[in-house]
From Swiss-Prot:
UniProt organism field: Bdellovibrio bacteriovorus (strain ATCC 15356 / DSM 50701 / NCIMB 9529 / HD100)
Family matches, as Pfam families: LpxC
The keyword Transmembrane helix belongs to this UniProt entry's keyword annotation: no
Cofactor or coenzyme needed: Zn(2+)
Domain of life from the UniProt record: Bacteria
Gene Ontology terms, MF aspect: metal ion binding; UDP-3-O-acyl-N-acetylglucosamine deacetylase activity
Name assigned to this protein: UDP-3-O-acyl-N-acetylglucosamine deacetylase
GO cellular component: membrane
Taxonomic placement: Bacteria, Pseudomonadati, Bdellovibrionota, Bdellovibrionia, Bdellovibrionales
HAMAP family: LpxC (MF_00388)
Amino acid sequence: MFLQKTIRKKTVVQGIGIHSGDPCTLTFRPAPADTGVYFIRTDLPGSPSLKVTARNVQATSHQTTIGGPAFSVATIEHCVSALSALRIDNLFIELDGPEIPIGDGSARVFLEALLAVGIVEQDQPRKYCYITEPIYFSEGEKHAYVVPYHGLRLTVTIDFPNPTIGKQTIDLDINEQSFGRDVANARTFGFMKDVEALKSRGLAKGGSLDNCIVLDGENVVNPEGLRWADEFVRHKCLDALGDLVTLEMPLMGHVVLYKAGHDVMNKLVRKIWDSPTSYRHVELGADISDEVRRYTGWTVPV
């Protein structure tokens, strides 16, 4: 039986907000079994909390923001992508402001902080959203679908007219090792013309070459260049993994994305919820292969 997990003890991440440029502090704290993942705004009266769920997603333009009637938390995807890869089910995430520290624009700072304090099993079984039939979502030239699979697999394709990016695809089985090796260090990216426009509107005050890949035409402005030639699609994989946390339950399925951003990911999660005959909520034993055959009738690839 696979058990739910949380962290062993609290850990703190400090940095600046990408839009405000202000210092901000994030504190990860253990949470009891069957809690889920909650953000807590300690800077507000009563320290209100907000669950990470697609139902609370308020904005999906260039990032994912969750919110309630009186407050919000912006750019959650880099942080929570690490939770998915580490199979952390229950966590309190305290914030002293509306933004999460941007770090270097990747998920590395969050992954390192969580691994440093350790991850512990809890006394309740881990419940999965087990895809049994294909689920599709399309919007113009953007496409997303999920099909049965014996783990979590992401195939992500992006296609930009800028030749430095162009068309890139990553196909990855997601686990702690593959995430740390192939995805966690991939940075967010943007174009110089867009950065200048954002700053003229009082946004992206914390943005710099230290936390974002910046392209000026076909040229990468960052002196150190790229960490991988396909760092762009690796980061989109990171984003998608973070957005899947809003499903509120770990997914077992193969997610295939084409030109799909945060908006499409939010709609895909909602489409899964709206397709109750295409998934089951299950607790998995040690023999994944037998479980897959029992619930889906699909054969696990050898």
